[in-house]
C-alpha cells in the first residue's frame, strides 16, 4: 500500500528556513527529516550552531563535520553559521556562560567566540571582533542571527538535559518574545523540538516491518532524561505537530545506509552519531509549535500589582540551575502582590480585535496554582476556570469569533505558594496561517503510511488521517483502488476500513 499527500508540492521559493541548534549533529536530531524537504521545495535553508562542540574534540574537527552534514541536508556552506561559543557539558567545574556576567572560561579554555576550518565566528564576521562568553553576549548574537535572516520557518531545540540545549532554548524564547513585541509585521512559524527525548534517545525500531512513528518517551524506559517534559507546559503529546519524512515520500523505499539522515549522521564521526540512527530515523518529525500570531504581543498590559510583562514575553518557564539535570524550573510569572484584593491583569488591544482562541499557562512548578481564574472580555465574564497543573494550558475555544478590545484575568482563588500566570496567548484563528498550507497524511495505528506492507493473512486495515491545519470535524473526500477499480466516498469522517481481495496488495491515497 502506498499513500502520498500534498505537503511536499508546496512552493517555498524565496522563503527562508533557520535551524538553531547547540552542537554539530543536533541539526540531524532537530531537522534531518524535514530540512531536505524544505530545500527541495525551494527554500533557502540556514543552520546556526551556537557552540563549536569543542569539549572533547577540536573545533576544526566538529565544524568540518557539521559543514559536511549540512550540505547533505540541503544547506549551502555560506548559509552555515557558527556563533563560536564553548561546548560546556553539565558539571564540568567551569561556570556556565548562562550564569556569567563576566567572561566565563569554557572547558576548552576559550573565553570568547572563535571560528575554525575556514569559518569565522558570527560576531567577528559581522562586527569585526569576537563576543565574550557571557549570557548577555550570547543573547545578543542569537537575536542578531534571527533578525538578520528573518526566516519564515524557525526550528530550535527545546529544554532537555544538556546545559547548552537549555541555554539556547530559553534564550531563543526570550529573544523571540522581544522581537515579536517590537515588530508586529514579523510572524514566522516557530517549531521547538526535543533533540534527546524524541531523536537521539529514540526507540531503535528502524527495522520494524513498517516504519514507526516517533514514540512518546517514557522516563526510565525509552530515555534516561529525568524530567518528563511531555507532561509539562505546552508539551502535550497529543498536540504535537507531525511532518511526513521527505525521504520516504519521494524514494518509495527504506534503506538505512541510503537515508540522508543516516548519511548526515555518519559525517559526525567524532561523535559516533550514526550509532543512534536506528532510533533517530522515524516515520515522522515531531515538533511543538510556539504560535507567533499571539495578539498579546501587540496589547498594552496592565496589572493591579506586580509586573505584567512576564505574562506576554514568550517564555513559559526559566531555569533555576543550568547544570542540574533535574533542577527545579525557574519561574517567569506575573503574580499579584500580597494584599492586592483586585489580583487582575488586563490586555488591551490597539483596536477591537476578533478573538477565537485563548490559551493561559500557569506556573510549571508543583508548589501552587490558580484554582479559579475569572476571564472577562470587555467587562463581560465569559467563565471562571482552574489552570491545569504543571503549567499546562487552559485552552478556551469560542463557539464563534468575538470582537474584543480588552481581556481581563482575575485570580479568584489560588492554592499553595509561588503561583502565577506564565504566559497568555490570544488568537483570531484556530491555526496560524502562513508559509505552510494545510495537509493530511494517511496513518494506521498511529504510524504514517508510505510503502506499507501487510502480511498475506491480513485482510483488513483501519486507516485514519492526520490533519495539519484542518479541523477534526471537517469532512474528507477519499478514494481507494483495490486493484479492481477505484472506489470513492464523500463526506466521510474518522476511520476508514480497507479490505483487500485474495492476491491483491491494493493501494490507497487521500
Ranges and model annotations:
Residues 326-383, 387-434:
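Aromatic, loop-rich ligand-recognition surfaces of beta-strand-rich domains
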Amino acid at each position: 500500500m502506498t499513500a502520498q499527500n500534498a505537503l511536499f508540492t508546496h512552493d517555498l521559493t524565496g522563503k527562508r528556513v533557520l535551524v538553531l541548534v547547540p552542537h554539530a549533529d543536533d541539526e540531524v536530531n532537530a531537522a534531518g527529516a524535514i530540512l531536505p524537504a524544505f530545500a527541495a521545495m525551494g527554500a533557502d535553508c540556514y543552520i546556526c550552531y551556537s557552540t563549536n562542540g569543542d569539549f572533547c574534540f577540536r573545533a576544526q574537527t566538529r565544524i568540518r563535520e557539521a559543514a559536511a552534514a549540512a550540505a547533505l541536508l540541503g544547506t549551502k556552506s555560506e548559509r552555515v553559521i557558527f556563533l563560536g561559543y564553548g561546548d560546556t557539558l553539565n558539571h564540568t567545574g567551569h561556570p556556565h556562560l548562562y550564569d556569567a556576567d563576566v567572561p566565563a572560561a569554557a572547558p576548552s579554555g576559550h573565553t570568547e567566540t572563535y571560528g575554525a576550518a575556514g569559518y569565522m565566528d558570527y560576531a567577528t564576521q559581522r562586527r569585526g571582533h569576537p563576543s565574550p562568553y557571557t549570557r548577555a553576549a550570547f543573547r545578543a548574537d542569537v537575536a542578531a542571527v534571527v533578525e538578520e535572516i528573518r526566516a519564515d520557518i524557525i526550528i530550535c531545540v527545546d529544554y532537555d538535559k544538556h546545559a547548552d540545549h537549555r541555554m539556547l532554548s530559553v534564550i531563543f524564547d526570550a529573544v523571540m518574545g522581544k522581537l515579536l513585541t517590537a515588530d508586529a509585521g514579523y510572524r514566522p512559524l516557530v517549531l521547538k523540538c526535543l533533540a534527546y527525548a524524541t531523536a537521539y534517545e529514540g526507540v531503535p525500531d528502524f527495522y520494524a516491518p513498517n516504519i514507526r512513528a516517533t514514540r512518546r518517551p517514557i522516563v526510565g524506559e525509552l530515555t534516561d532524561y529525568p524530567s518528563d517534559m511531555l507532561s509539562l507546559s505546552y508539551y502535550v503529546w497529543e498536540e504535537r505537530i507531525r511532518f511526513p519524512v521527505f525521504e520516504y515520500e519521494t524514494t518509495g523505499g527504506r534503506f538505512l545506509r541510503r537515508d540522508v539522515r543516516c548519511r548526515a549522521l555518519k559525517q559526525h564521526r567524532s561523535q559516533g552519531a550514526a550509532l543512534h540512527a536506528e532510533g533517530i530515523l522515524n516515520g515522522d518529525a515531531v515538533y511543538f509549535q510556539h504560535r507567533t500570531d499571539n495578539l498579546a504581543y501587540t496589547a498594552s498590559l496592565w496589572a493591579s500589582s506586580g509586573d505584567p510583562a512576564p505574562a506576554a514575553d514568550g517564555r513559559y518557564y526559566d531555569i533555576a540551575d543550568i547544570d542540574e539535570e533535574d533542577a527545579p524550573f525557574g519561574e517567569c510569572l506575573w503574580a499579584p502582590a500580597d494584599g492586592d484584593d483586585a489580583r487582575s491583569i488586563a490586555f488591551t488591544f490597539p483596536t477591537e480585535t476578533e478573538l477565537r482562541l485563548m490559551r493561559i499557562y500557569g506556573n510549571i512548578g508543583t508548589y501552587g496554582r490558580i484554582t479559579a481564574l475569572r476571564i472577562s472580555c470587555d467587562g463581560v465574564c465569559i467563565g471562571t476556570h482552574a489552570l491545569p497543573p504543571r503549567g499546562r494550558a487552559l485552552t478556551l475555544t469560542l463557539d464563534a469569533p468575538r470582537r474584543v478590545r480588552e481581556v481581563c484575568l482575575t485570580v479568584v482563588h489560588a492554592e499553595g505558594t509561588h503561583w502565577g500566570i506564565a504566559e497568555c496567548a490570544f488568537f483570531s484563528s484556530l491555526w496560524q496561517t502562513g508559509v505552510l498550507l494545510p495537509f493530511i497524511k494517511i496513518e494506521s495505528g498511529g504510524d504514517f503510511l508510505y510503502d506499507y506492507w501487510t502480511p498475506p493473512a491480513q485482510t483488513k486495515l483501519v486507516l485514519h488521517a492526520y490533519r495539519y491545519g484542518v479541523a477534526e470535524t471537517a469532512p474528507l473526500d477519499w478514494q481507494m483502488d483495490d486493484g479492481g477499480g477505484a472506489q470513492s466516498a464523500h463526506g466521510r469522517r474518522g476511520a476508514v476500513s480497507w479490505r483487500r481481495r485474495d492476491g491483491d496488495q491494493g493501494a490507497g491515497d487521500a
